[in-house]
C-alpha cells in the first residue's frame, strides 16, 4: 500500500490545522444507550493522537440507514456522548453536518478539541450515485477545514462504500490512512497472502447469499470452511436433507452444490454440522431439542421445527478443527446467540478461538457483537475487525473505494 499514514501527517505538523477524520461510530443502540462501544473505543487512538498534536478535529460518521434526512433515532448524540466520556480531550457535537451549527462550532474550535458532525447520512448526497451530488456535499465538508486542511480515513467499516465522506473528500484534500484502517488491512492481508496453514474459516449468519462471493474466493485458499448459522440449512438441503421450517434459500441450492463439488478439487473441505438445536418457534423460551442434522423433521416438532443453533457434537468438532489451525477467520454467529438457549454454538466457537494458539480474526458486525454479548474480552482474540461488510468484500477480492482512493 502506498497510502500516506497518520504518522506522516503528524510529522508534517497539525497544530492549529483542521483535520477531517472519517470515524466509525456506527454502534448499536437501545434507545439512547450505546449497547456495544467497541467501535467508539477503536476510534479513540487516532482522535487522541491528533488532539495531542494540537489539531482541530472534525469527525464525520454515520449511524444506521436514515433515508437522507434527519431522524432522531439515528442521531450521533449517544455515540458522541460516549466518546466524550471515554476521551481526555473536549468533544462537542454539531446539530447538523454542514449547516450553521457545524460552521459556528468549527469556527470556535481550539487546538486539541474535537467536533463531531451530525450523521452524514442525514444528507442524501452522502450516498448518492450521482458523482456531482456527492462532490457538492464533499465540497461543503472540505470547506469546514479552511485553507490548510487534511483528511484521515479511520473508518474501516465504511471503506467499501463510494460515499462522499469516504471517497470524494479524499480526492479534494491531502489524504492519510488512519491507524485503525491500516491495522485492519494488514490483518486481512495475513488472511489472503502468506497465510499460515492450516487456515480454517468459520462462516455463520443467517443468509448463505451474503457469503457466496467470499466462499467462492476462499476455495483453494482456506483448508477448511466450517458452516454454521442459518446458512447451514441451505448446505443441508444441497446435500439432499429436509430442513423442516428452518431458514432456507432454495434459489441458492444449486450454487452451494457447485461449491461442494469444486471444493475437493480446490483442496478445501467443508465441514457441515452433524447435529442441530431445533425449536418449536422463534422465541427465547421456545421448546427445543438436539437432533441429527440429517433428521431434522424427525424432531418432536416435525415439519414445523426451526433450527436455531448448531448442536454440541458439531460445536466440539468445530472446536477441534480450530485447535489444529494456525490461522482462523470467523464471520457470523452459529445460532441465535441473543437467546440464551441458542447461544451455545456461538459461545463454543468464541471459546475455541480464545483457547487456540492460532492467529485469530473475528470479522466485525454480528460476530463482534456476539463475543462481547457473551462476555468475552476483545483482548482474548488476535483481532476483532470493526468492519463486517468491508472485511468480507476485502476477502472477496473486491476493490474497496475508500482504500483505492488513498493509494498513490
Curated annotation (Swiss-Prot):
GO terms for cellular component: cytosol. Coiled coil: none annotated. One of its GO terms (biological process) is gluconeogenesis. Keywords: ATP-binding, Cytoplasm, Glycolysis, Kinase, Nucleotide-binding, Transferase. Signal peptide: none annotated. It is found in: Cytoplasm. It catalyses: (2R)-3-phosphoglycerate + ATP = (2R)-3-phospho-glyceroyl phosphate + ADP. Pfam families: PGK (PF00162). Its EC number is 2.7.2.3. InterPro entries: Phosphoglycerate_kinase, Phosphoglycerate_kinase_N, Phosphoglycerate_kinase_sf. Gene3D superfamilies: Phosphoglycerate kinase, N-terminal domain (3.40.50.1260). Monomer. This is Phosphoglycerate kinase. The gene is pgk.
Amino acid at each position: 500500500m502506498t497510502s500516506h499514514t497518520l504518522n506522516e501527517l503528524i510529522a508534517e505538523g497539525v497544530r492549529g490545522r483542521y483535520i477531517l477524520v472519517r470515524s466509525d461510530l456506527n454502534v448499536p443502540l437501545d434507545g439512547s444507550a450505546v449497547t456495544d462501544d467497541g467501535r467508539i473505543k477503536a476510534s479513540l487512538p487516532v482522535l487522541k493522537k491528533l488532539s495531542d498534536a494540537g489539531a482541530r478535529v472534525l469527525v464525520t460518521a454515520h449511524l444506521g440507514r436514515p433515508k437522507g434526512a434527519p431522524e432522531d433515532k439515528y442521531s450521533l448524540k449517544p455515540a458522541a456522548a460516549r466518546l466524550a466520556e471515554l476521551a481526555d480531550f473536549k468533544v462537542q457535537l454539531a446539530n447538523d453536518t454542514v449547516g450553521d451549527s457545524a460552521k459556528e462550532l468549527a469556527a470556535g474550535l481550539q487546538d486539541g478539541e474535537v467536533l463531531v458532525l451530525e450523521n452524514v447520512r442525514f444528507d442524501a448526497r452522502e450516498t448518492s450515485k450521482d458523482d456531482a451530488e456527492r462532490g457538492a456535499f464533499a465540497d461543503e465538508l472540505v470547506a469546514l477545514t479552511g485553507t490548510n486542511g487534511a483528511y484521515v480515513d479511520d473508518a474501516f467499516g465504511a471503506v467499501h462504500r463510494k460515499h462522499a465522506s469516504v471517497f470524494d473528500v479524499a480526492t479534494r484534500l491531502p489524504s492519510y490512512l488512519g491507524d485503525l484502517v491500516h491495522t485492519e488491512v494488514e490483518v486481512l492481508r495475513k488472511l489472503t497472502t502468506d497465510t499460515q496453514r492450516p487456515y480454517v474459516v468459520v462462516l455463520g449468519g443467517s443468509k448463505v447469499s451474503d457469503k457466496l462471493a467470499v466462499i467462492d474466493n476462499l476455495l483453494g485458499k482456506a483448508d477448511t470452511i466450517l458452516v454454521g448459522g442459518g446458512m447451514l440449512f441451505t448446505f443441508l438441503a444441497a446435500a439432499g436433507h429436509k430442513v423442516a421450517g428452518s431458514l432456507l434459500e432454495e434459489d441458492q441450492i444449486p450454487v452451494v452444490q457447485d461449491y461442494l463439488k469444486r471444493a475437493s478439487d480446490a483442496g478445501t473441505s467443508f465441514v457441515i454440522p452433524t447435529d442441530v438445536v431445533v425449536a418449536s418457534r422463534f422465541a427465547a423460551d421456545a421448546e427445543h431439542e438436539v437432533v441429527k442434522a440429517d433428521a431434522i423433521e424427525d424432531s418432536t416438532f416435525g415439519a414445523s421445527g426451526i433450527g436455531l443453533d448448531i448442536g454440541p457434537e458439531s460445536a466440539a468438532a468445530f472446536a477441534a478443527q480450530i485447535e489444529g489451525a494456525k490461522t482462523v477467520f470467523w464471520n457470523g454467529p452459529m445460532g441465535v446467540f441473543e437467546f440464551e438457549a441458542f447461544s451455545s454454538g456461538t459461545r463454543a466457537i468464541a471459546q475455541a478461538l480464545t483457547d487456540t494458539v492460532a492467529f485469530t480474526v473475528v470479522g466485525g458486525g454480528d460476530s463482534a457483537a456476539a463475543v462481547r454479548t457473551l462476555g468475552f474480552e476483545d483482548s482474548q482474540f488476535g483481532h476483532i475487525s470493526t468492519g463486517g461488510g468491508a472485511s468480507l468484500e476485502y476477502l472477496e477480492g473486491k476493490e474497496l473505494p475508500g482504500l483505492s482512493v488513498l493509494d498513490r
